[in-house]
Amino acid sequence: MSKEDVIEVEGKVVEALPNAMFEVELENGHKVLAHISGKLRMNFIRILPGDKVTVELSPYDLTRGRITWRAK
């Protein structure tokens, strides 16, 4: 899957789950299960419930995603 195939959407973290997984509610109301991308993990970026995040979704599975950015 190339970089052009992903769908980027904004959302809000609803719940922090084990193993660096998060439940994120998207702007359109859907809830997805998302994990932290490698760059956020390497730089120890903390993500807490209530944070606004950018999520990348695969066109093949729209229920799972990757958190790529945390808004300030």
UniProtKB/Swiss-Prot annotation:
SMART domains named in the record: S1
Functional note: One of the essential components for the initiation of protein synthesis. Stabilizes the binding of IF-2 and IF-3 on the 30S subunit to which N-formylmethionyl-tRNA(fMet) subsequently binds. Helps modulate mRNA selection, yielding the 30S pre-initiation complex (PIC). Upon addition of the 50S ribosomal subunit IF-1, IF-2 and IF-3 are released leaving the mature 70S translation initiation complex.
Protein name per UniProt: Translation initiation factor IF-1
Keyword list, A-Z: Cytoplasm, Initiation factor, Protein biosynthesis, RNA-binding, rRNA-binding
Family of the protein in this entry: Belongs to the IF-1 family.
GO terms assigned for molecular function: ribosome binding; rRNA binding; translation initiation factor activity
A Gene Ontology cellular-component term: cytosol
Gene: infA
Subcellular location: Cytoplasm
Quaternary structure, from the entry: Component of the 30S ribosomal translation pre-initiation complex which assembles on the 30S ribosome in the order IF-2 and IF-3, IF-1 and N-formylmethionyl-tRNA(fMet); mRNA recruitment can occur at any time during PIC assembly.
Domain S1-like: start-end pairs: 1-72
Transmembrane segments: none
